[in-house]
A protein has these predicted regions:
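Acidic/histidine-rich catalytic neighborhood of metal-dependent amide-processing enzymes
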Residues: 1-53
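Metal-dependent amide/peptide-bond hydrolase catalytic core
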Residues: 55-184
Length: 184
């Protein structure tokens, strides 16, 4: 049998494929070949990187910008977090597998947005960072999350010295496993 299936909303919420998988299971369709037409422009591929998306929320203490020592600036801590992610991006490049079939050949990392603060003269009490990684292997995803989580604990410790209710919370938006070649 040949089955045609289409998904939707794969660039923003990524909800089409999980719904399709549930439906295929319900109908007991377990075929082993899939052709994905986007973003490859119908070029046949036999593997793809994983895609892990996160939003990290920072909560500090607002105050007037003329008295920075009386607040905990969530935007400043979010900036430190982003800087750490960027340094980890260099590590990911250095960890690239010698036999990688991907372009680029290493796990990628992207900051999709930084949002926080309400005015120039107000210490930002809230900020969040949208970011994603496209690991070429499971180990890179584990490495990246372990390193950034340790760093977030360090930042939170600093924040809590000034404001015990400060918080840093990483929310998983989606973690989609990669598909890797079985044969070369």
């Amino acid at each position: 049998d040949i089955h045609f299936s289409l998904t939707f909303d794969e660039e923003t919420a990524c909800i089409g494929a999980p719904l399709l998988i549930k439906e295929l299971k319900k109908r007991k369709i377990t075929n082993g070949i899939c052709i994905v037409g986007e973003p490859t422009e119908m070029k046949i591929i036999d593997s793809h990187k994983a895609c892990d998306e996160y939003t990290t929320f920072f909560e500090g203490l607002a105050g007037h910008s003329s008295k920075p020592d009386e607040g905990v600036n969530a935007a400043e801590y979010a900036s430190k977090y982003v800087n750490k992610l960027m340094s980890l991006r260099s590590d990911l490049i250095n960890r690239k597998p010698k036999d990688s079939i991907f372009t680029p050949s290493y796990s990628t990392l992207s900051i999709g947005g930084i949002f926080g603060g309400i005015a120039h003269n107000v210490i930002a009490d809230k900020c969040h960072v949208n970011w994603e990684t496209r690991p070429v292997n499971k180990e890179d995803g584990i490495f990246l999350n372990s390193e950034i989580d340790k760093y977030a604990e360090k930042l939170l410790s600093e924040m809590k010295k000034k404001y015990p209710d400060a918080s840093i919370k990483k929310k998983i938006i989606g973690e989609r496993i990669g598909v890797f070649r079985v044969c070369r």
